[in-house]
Amino acid sequence: MGNHYIPNSAHKEEMLKEIGLSSIEELFADIPEKFIKEELNLPEGKSEYEVFLEMNEILEKNKTVLEMPTFLGAGTYFHYIPAHVKHLIERSEFLTSYTPYQPEISQGMLQALFEYQSLIAELVGLPVVNSSMYDWGTAMAEAALMTVRLHKGKRKKFVVPKHTHPERLQVLRTYTRGPEVEIVTVNWNERGQVDVEDLKEKVKDAAGVYIEIPNFFGLLEEEIREVGEIAHEAGAYFVVGVDPTILGIVEAPGELGADIVVGEASYFGNPMNFGGPRAGIFAVKNDMKLIRQMPGRIIGMTKDAEGKRAFVMTLQTREQHIRRAKATSNICSNEALVAVAAAIHIASLGPKGIRELGEVILKNTAYLKKRLSEVAEIPFDGVNFKDVLVRFDKPYREIHEELLKRNIHGGYYVGSHFPELGEAALFAATETTRKEWVDALISALKEVI
């Protein structure tokens, strides 16, 4: 007897009869025999339970950061995520309501994204925020193109520090190759920060000037206000990239004179997850000239025909809904679920929690830096947040291999990006870094070096 839900031969025979065939082999009669008669190098099929056991055996080879302490930062960090964040974003109202072509139907998702925008605006000190980009790198690249558009193409130069995160710099170069925007890099000084004198020589006719908080070496740029003033005096827009977990303990980029702020929202509420997905921050001043040139989607609050509060996608004429050549951006979606997770985490922390988070990271980074200075050279003096640059006399790859043997994941090798730094690596700490992990790292380094 045929059953609608269990595979059986009755259904198969019925379908074959309908198309006038007597066997499955006849379906593939047109394929030359030499291609279908050869034995495939495949194992015998397994039951679902057997597959489960095999997959579990493979997965057990992985090690979490709790089983193997990691100091590998350089843009991806282990942060603690409160349990309720995952629980809330897994609700079907969020998990399945990808912004549709009639977005006003999903009022809950639009409101959540509006709250994300509002929270980020408060953090970065600029009033207008979009509902996210793909990541920090794409946000920075879109900011560069935006500054060129704002100058109506008369200026096609974007100035960035040489010590911008190398992968973000790669994304920027990819984005700007087609529009033929010139990327000019500014050297760092003896303290590992932007060389202001070099900037003054290169800023002429620039559409925008970019700087990061903290920079790739983990250092806080002490002359960031001056960098902004130099940019504005040259008629360029000032773009600041920021790790938002620091914003509880430093001035907001908007207060430092930034016209555009970009960054990485996924440091809140989202796991490392092999580096993605992420959500890029994009914020601008309250200037319609800038707002109309923003990339991505903006969620606005208004009233419907009955006078009730409603959330909408606003200023959509900037987007890909119009002719492609006229659109400010052709990023076709945002990272909505990642942004909602970030919003939930930020709201849960509140102003006091955000400040305490920054203070703990700063304290842990300082301890890591102090202990690392006992075994290696710290080439740049200054205040570090998360990342610390360390230089060794011995090839770092050898050191790293030895650390792995001792169940410790070392720092990120930067010598391939900046050969002039020698055998250097970035070691990172966050609020999750434990004192005993750092002590174990130093003990291991003393053995290895």
From Swiss-Prot:
EC number(s) per entry: 1.4.4.2
BP GO terms, sorted: glycine decarboxylation via glycine cleavage system; nucleoside metabolic process
Keyword match Oxidoreductase: yes
Gene Ontology MF annotations: glycine dehydrogenase (decarboxylating) activity
Annotated keywords: Oxidoreductase
InterPro entries per UniProt: GcvPA, GDC-P_N, GDC_P, PyrdxlP-dep_Trfase, PyrdxlP-dep_Trfase_major, PyrdxlP-dep_Trfase_small
Top-rank EC class of the record's enzyme: oxidoreductase
Source organism superkingdom: Archaea
Catalytic activity reported: N(6)-[(R)-lipoyl]-L-lysyl-[glycine-cleavage complex H protein] + glycine + H(+) = N(6)-[(R)-S(8)-aminomethyldihydrolipoyl]-L-lysyl-[glycine-cleavage complex H protein] + CO2
Family under the similarity heading: Belongs to the GcvP family. N-terminal subunit subfamily.
Subunit structure: The glycine cleavage system is composed of four proteins: P, T, L and H. In this organism, the P 'protein' is a heterodimer of two subunits.
Role of this protein: The glycine cleavage system catalyzes the degradation of glycine. The P protein binds the alpha-amino group of glycine through its pyridoxal phosphate cofactor; CO(2) is released and the remaining methylamine moiety is then transferred to the lipoamide cofactor of the H protein.
Matching HAMAP family: GcvPA (MF_00712)
Name of this chain's protein: Probable glycine dehydrogenase (decarboxylating) subunit 1
Organism the protein comes from: Pyrococcus horikoshii (strain ATCC 700860 / DSM 12428 / JCM 9974 / NBRC 100139 / OT-3)
Gene name tied to this protein: gcvPA
